[in-house]
A protein has these predicted regions:
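Short helix-to-coil transition segments within interhelical loops
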Residues: 123-129
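Short hydrophobic, aromatic-rich alpha-helical segments embedded in or entering the lipid bilayer
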Residues: 242-260
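Transmembrane helix irregularities
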Residues: 125, 215-216
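Membrane-proximal extracellular/periplasmic loop immediately following the first transmembrane helix
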Residues: 1-47
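Central hydrophobic cores of alpha-helical transmembrane segments
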Residues: 220-233, 249-251
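Secretory targeting signals
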Residues: 31, 37, 41-113, 134-215, ...
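Transmembrane helix-loop junctions in multipass membrane proteins, especially transporters and channels
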Residues: 156-168, 218, 238, 242, ...
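Junction motif at the cytosolic side of a transmembrane helix
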Residues: 211-215, 277-296
Length: 296
C-alpha cells in the first residue's frame, strides 16, 4: 500500500531513502574516507622528512614539507551530490571549437592586406606600422574574448540547468577529481579562474595565428600551418606543458594534483608556474609580431 510520510526519513519514506542511498553511496563513502586518505598521505610525508634527517633543505625535503602545508588543515564536513559540477569542470570540447573559429577569423588579419595591395598604403600612413599592428592585436584579444565568453556561458548554463550545481560554495578539494589539488579556493572561484586560464591560452594561440599572418602574403598557408600548429600543441601535450597554450585550455587536468618541478632545489607548483610561463610566451609573441620585418 501507499507509504505514510515520516519526518525521520530524508525523503519522507524508507523506500525512497534506499533509492537515494543506492545512487549516492559511492560518493558518500568516498567523501567519508577523504580524511583518512589525507592522514595517510601526510603520514607518508612526515616519515620521509624524519628519514631525511638533516637533508630537509633539499628539493625532496621541501616538497614533502609542501605536502604537509598544503593538506594539513583539509577535511570534508558536509556532503553534496556534486556529479554535475564534476562533469562540467572536465568538459573541454568547446575550447577546441573556439580555436577553430579563431583560426578562421584571425588567419587573414594581416595577410589579407598584402593580398589586396593595401599593405604599402597602410605602411605610409600616419598611424601605420606598429600602431596598426597593435590595434590588430587588441582586436584579436576582443574577438577571442567574445567567442570564449559565448561558449563558456552556454556550457555553464547548460550544465547548471541539466545537472544542477550542488555544493558549489564548498572547497574545490571536495570534488572527487580534485581531492589532491593544491588550490585552496571554492568551486565557484575555481570556475572563474578556469575561464581566465582558458582565455589566456586562447590569446596565446591567437597570437601565433597573427604571427603567421604577418609572415605570409597569402591566407591559405596561414590557415594550413595554423591547423598544424593546433595539432602540434595537442600532440606534445604534457612534455612541454609550461609553454604549451593547450595546457591552459585543459586547466582542470593541471589543477587536479600537486605537481611540482625543481627550481634551484625549491619545489615550484606547476599550477602556479603555468600561467606565468604563458604570459611570458604572450609577451614574446607580441614582440615578434611588432618587430617582424614582413609586418606592413
Amino acid at each position: 500500500g501507499q507509504q505514510i510520510p515520516n519526518d525521520k526519513y530524508y525523503t519522507k519514506t524508507p523506500y525512497d531513502d534506499s533509492i537515494v542511498y543506492d545512487e549516492l553511496k559511492e560518493e558518500m563513502q568516498r567523501q567519508s574516507e577523504y580524511n583518512d586518505s589525507l592522514k595517510a598521505l601526510k603520514g607518508y610525508a612526515q616519515e620521509n622528512l624524519a628519514y631525511m634527517g638533516d637533508l630537509t633543505d633539499t628539493y625532496e625535503g621541501r616538497r614533502n614539507q609542501l605536502i604537509l602545508d598544503t593538506y594539513g588543515e583539509r577535511a570534508i564536513h558536509s556532503f553534496y551530490d556534486q556529479t554535475g559540477l564534476g562533469a562540467y569542470l572536465k568538459y573541454d570540447f568547446s575550447s577546441l571549437l573556439v580555436l577553430l573559429l579563431l583560426l578562421l577569423g584571425i588567419s587573414p588579419i594581416i595577410s589579407s592586406e598584402k593580398e589586396t595591395g593595401m599593405a604599402p598604403l597602410l605602411a605610409s600612413s600616419r598611424f601605420g606600422r606598429h600602431k596598426t599592428i597593435a590595434a590588430k592585436i587588441g582586436a584579436m584579444a576582443l574577438f577571442t574574448a567574445f567567442f570564449a565568453a559565448c561558449f563558456f556561458l552556454m556550457d555553464f548554463l547548460y550544465y547548471m540547468v541539466a545537472a544542477e550545481f550542488h555544493g558549489a560554495g564548498s572547497a574545490l578539494y571536495t570534488l572527487i577529481d580534485f581531492k589532491y589539488t593544491p588550490l585552496t579556493c571554492t568551486i565557484w572561484q575555481y570556475i572563474l579562474l578556469q575561464w581566465l586560464a582558458k582565455w589566456l591560452g586562447m590569446i596565446a594561440v591567437g597570437l601565433f595565428f597573427v604571427l603567421l599572418s604577418s609572415i605570409f602574403r597569402e591566407t591559405y598557408p596561414v590557415f594550413i600551418l595554423g591547423t598544424g600548429l593546433i595539432a602540434l600543441f595537442m600532440t606534445v601535450g604534457e612534455r612541454f606543458r609550461l609553454f604549451n597554450p593547450i595546457s591552459m585550455l585543459t586547466f582542470s587536468e593541471q589543477a587536479q594534483e600537486l605537481s611540482t618541478f625543481n627550481f634551484f632545489d625549491y619545489p615550484v607548483l606547476t599550477i602556479t608556474a603555468l600561467p606565468i610561463s604563458i604570459l611570458l610566451l604572450v609577451f614574446v609573441l607580441v614582440l615578434l609580431i611588432l618587430s617582424h620585418r614582413y609586418v606592413l
